[in-house]
Amino acid sequence: MFSVPAISEDRFVEYFEIQIAQSDTTVITGLVGSQIKDSVFIAKTLLKNNKQKFGLNEIKDFHIHFTNNDIFKDGPSASLGIFMAILYYQKYHTKMKLINSDFTFLVTGDVDLRGNVKEIGGLKEKRKFFRKENFSLFVIPKEGNEVLRYSDELSCDNIYDTLSIIEKRASHVEKI
């Protein structure tokens, strides 16, 4: 199982868990809206259509459960994080490999079917959380954010930029 934290009201919450599905379909459970569901299927489509670029032989169906059913989850800003989590899970789950590192990063952005990372709202709150929690890197959409405020904040146009940024900043993270 692979779990990913997220931000809610300036605190971490366990956001979702991913594991291989026992069926031949991707399953989404939890208290989520249509934008979150769309983000999961966009991520899966991008991975299926570009699996060789990501070093994947196949894309396994999975069950993704959005935890904390007392908190409704929706909005496009989680798209990039969902994509990254599904990519890492697809890449490493069969090897049972966990990346143990002091390098922690936060990503935010709305991902479309071409892999572009689009502008999102609430960036002020996300920056505040990033500073408070002392992450190593914060990756935000380039669209709408021409001025970066901190040296540990970088912007991206698409999912490939995001992966390149993370690989360059974290030399000890295995290449994707």
Regions found by a protein language model. Name each.
Residues 1-176:
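Peripheral, non-AAA+ core regions of ATP-driven protein-machinery
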